[in-house]
Amino acid sequence: MKFLLSCLCFFTFLSFTFAQTGALPTVRTKLGHLTLYVNNERGNFNGINDLPASFSHSFGTDQEATPLSIVSEQDSISVTLRHGTPAVFRIVRQAKGDTVLCRFSSHKEAKAARFPDAYKKANQGKTLILIPEVYELINVVFALTTYGKTDAIYKNTPYFQAVMAHFSPFAGHAAVRTIDSLLTQSEDHYAPLKMDSYAYLFTGDRITKEGTYDRTSWGEVNTLEPYIPLLEDFARKSKYRNFYRDHQSYYNGLILDFQQNIDVATMKRWLEQQFPRTRYSAVKVLFTPLVGWNQSANQFEDNGFSEAHAHVNFPFVGKNADRQPASLVKGQRMMIIFTELNHSYLNPEADRYAKEIAVAYRDLSGWITTGKPSAGYSNPLSCFEEYMNYGLVTLLYSDLFDAATFATLKTGLEKSMVENRGFQRFREFDEELLKLYQNRKPGQTVADLYPAIIAWAARR
């Protein structure tokens, strides 16, 4: 799973020259990414080794002066972002043997979401499961692209066959060609385009901003906005809105299954009990039957109201489910949404211990495996968070299921994490975290166990 946080940057690359006076702040890295803290809000700075020798970027900020920290696996630097005035620093790319010259400034930010009092009143305390109309539209377009031929699109349903039968004649439409070209350039475009579609709704044949959200992905602009006219034309010519209406009962059935059998509200209550410093006024789970595996999350706050979004694939029941106990099937199906929702709770807590985690996980060679999915978690903080992510699954299972079901679920989870995903020490980590949880003092929460599990990791 590739997980990106809310201050992910969309960079504009520019050449520039300037007079260099004194030593510039410098951060060194052997990896392809860094961690950014903009006013203490963390985000991933990916693609370091693909950057040109010089580039600029402007962050959207509320304040004229904002602290920025840039952290690698080796060291860190801090600069001040100012509206219209660049802060200059260097990144030494040890893997490439060169240096990137960087100029970062800031500008007044447009809020990603606005929650007026009426919205707060209507949504306070709610957990909503949604298949939005424009959201499904962009996923239909994804299914028609070259990227759609991969496992990123779930194909084992009659619904997928209906999508292809209806929309394949429009595979040559400019909207499909344009989105296909973006995904060919980089699959990293996929999640922001999908997520940002939730900011829109249909008004007749027009696709317009819903009003609550300017953007629902991690960047400072809505990545889908330039392509809205193409999507409007595609929807009109393909009669997409008729297709969506004709399948409303199917969507409603999936949503009902989610509500009755996945029980996101229970997950939210458990997470709030275990991470009492983190609270969300509402939770929205957005999905489509077309997503094969890609998951992502984001959070928003305005006017004293906070909202967590989880973008997930639907947990379809496997072919052999009827041969398994119902409790085992339920546990397996819960994992998809829980491992995305819990990032909104465990990550803010991990940020409080970033320095200790950097020391404990300074040598990742024994924690992740080259050539397996774990290799994508190649900085200490993201590695620890992914271990905790699935460790929390074990803790939740221990509270919800009987001993036999729990043992089966735990064994399967650990096998998958170690053998399939390549997290070498997950069994040890999982056992230690479970032991700490089961032996915690009265009133202690999972958040209180962070120092102990980090100290355990430091001794490995």
Kindly give the residue locations of the regions a language model identified.
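Bacterial Sec-dependent N-terminal signal peptides
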Residues: M1-A23
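N-terminal low-structure segments adjacent to metalloprotease catalytic domains
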Residues: Q20-K239
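Pan-zinc metallopeptidase signature
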Residues: G22-L36, S54, F59, G84-T85, ...
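Auxiliary, metal-adjacent structural segments of Zn-dependent hydrolase domains
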Residues: A53-G60, T66-L68, Y251-H309
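Active-site scaffold of zinc-dependent metalloenzymes
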Residues: G211-Y213, N298-G331
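Second-shell loop/turn segments in exported
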Residues: D214-S217, G253-N261, R323-P325, Q332, ...
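Active-site recognition of the HExxH zinc-binding catalytic motif
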Residues: V329-K355
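Post-HEXXH active-site segment of zinc metalloproteases
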Residues: P348-S374
